[in-house]
């Protein structure tokens, strides 16, 4: 069972429909017990970083997400949800994030139109489970104005938009997609299937303990 975190700032319906399409079991929730009972977690997000962190704090979800990370449960952040995984952001004001990944969220400084919106090529930087079954250079759908300034060793895929934009990031059981898998057609469905596979593997490992 995958828990989609509902905190009022995500593409909940799009993610829900995508998981339904691939046949994944899921629940939309902000309940701590339900999140911790799940086998994997998706943190979606659309909007401003400071507001999102305020809402997560108000709903006591910051501690829950850190606990999810600590116990090794697979966690996938999408778009703003990915950005929230990092240590801090400069969006609107200096603001602390969840601190589950090293790095900071910064404004795109490019001559191109901002936000970076539309399809872009995703190039492989290193292997990790969410790449399974994907062709290097597949096109995915972006909508964002900020990017993750983070260590190279956690960047698994990049896109070019006047600069290299980390599209895929990962460290241990924590995964992030700056783009929207749920809006990226069959490529996105494969990515979500891959995450489902990671979740099932983690569930099996817990049953064998």
UniProtKB/Swiss-Prot annotation:
Tell me, what does this protein do in biology? IGPS catalyzes the conversion of PRFAR and glutamine to IGP, AICAR and glutamate. The HisH subunit catalyzes the hydrolysis of glutamine to glutamate and ammonia as part of the synthesis of IGP and AICAR. The resulting ammonia molecule is channeled to the active site of HisF.
One Pfam family it belongs to: GATase
PROSITE patterns recorded for this chain?
GATASE_TYPE_1 (PS51273)
Its assembly, as annotated, is:
Heterodimer of HisH and HisF.
Q: Does the keyword Lyase apply?
A: yes
Q: What is its EC number?
A: 4.3.2.10, 3.5.1.2
What protein name is recorded for this chain? Imidazole glycerol phosphate synthase subunit HisH
The subcellular localization recorded is: Cytoplasm
Question: InterPro entries, alphabetically?
Answer: Class_I_gatase-like, GATASE, Imidazole-glycPsynth_HisH
Q: Name one GO biological process term.
A: L-histidine biosynthetic process
Catalysed reaction(s) here are: 5-[(5-phospho-1-deoxy-D-ribulos-1-ylimino)methylamino]-1-(5-phospho-beta-D-ribosyl)imidazole-4-carboxamide + L-glutamine = D-erythro-1-(imidazol-4-yl)glycerol 3-phosphate + 5-amino-1-(5-phospho-beta-D-ribosyl)imidazole-4-carboxamide + L-glutamate + H(+); L-glutamine + H2O = L-glutamate + NH4(+)
Gene Ontology annotations for the cellular component aspect, listed alphabetically: cytoplasm
Q: Annotated pathway, please?
A: Amino-acid biosynthesis; L-histidine biosynthesis; L-histidine from 5-phospho-alpha-D-ribose 1-diphosphate: step 5/9
The main place the protein resides is: cytoplasm
Q: What organism, scientifically named, is this protein from?
A: Bacillus cereus (strain B4264)
The record's gene field reads: hisH
The active site lies at 79 (nucleophile), 180, 182
- The segment(s) forming the Glutamine amidotransferase type-1 domain are 1-205
Listed A to Z, the keywords are: Amino-acid biosynthesis, Cytoplasm, Glutamine amidotransferase, Histidine biosynthesis, Hydrolase, Lyase
